[in-house]
C-alpha cells in the first residue's frame, strides 16, 4: 500500500451496505474514532471518509465537537433513514441491527462452541 489515501483491498460490483452505513456504524462504535481508523476499518480512503462524514453531518445524522486536536462524534439515533421505503426506520434501529449482526458473527473458539 502506498500513500496515506491508499485503500487496503479493492473490490468491484455492488455491496449490501453503503459506505455511508459503514462509516456511521464505525462512528457509533467509537465516538472518538479517528478518520484514519474509520478508513482502515471500512477499506476507504481518508478523503472518502471525510466526504461521507460531511454528508452525514449535513443531513443531520451525526454531529461533531472538537476536543483538543481530535473530534468527538455524536450519532443522532432518532433520525429516520432517507429512502422512502425505510422512512419508518431510524438510524438507531439500523445500528442495532448491524451491532447484533456483528455479535452473531464473532469467530468461535473451542471455548465458546
What are these regions (language model features)?
Residues 47:
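Key DNA-contact positions within bacterial/archaeal DNA-binding proteins
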Residues 37-40, 57-58:
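Alpha-helical residues within the helix-turn-helix
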Residues 21-26:
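Pre-recognition alpha-helix immediately N-terminal to the DNA-recognition helix
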Residues 51, 55:
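Alpha-helical DNA-recognition elements
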Residues 57-67:
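A short, conserved structural fragment
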Residues 1-8, 80-113:
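Amphipathic alpha-helical dimerization/coiled-coil segments
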Residues 31-32, 43:
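Central "turn" residue of the DNA-binding helix-turn-helix
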Residues 9-20, 34, 66-89:
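Short, cationic-aromatic polyanion-contact patches
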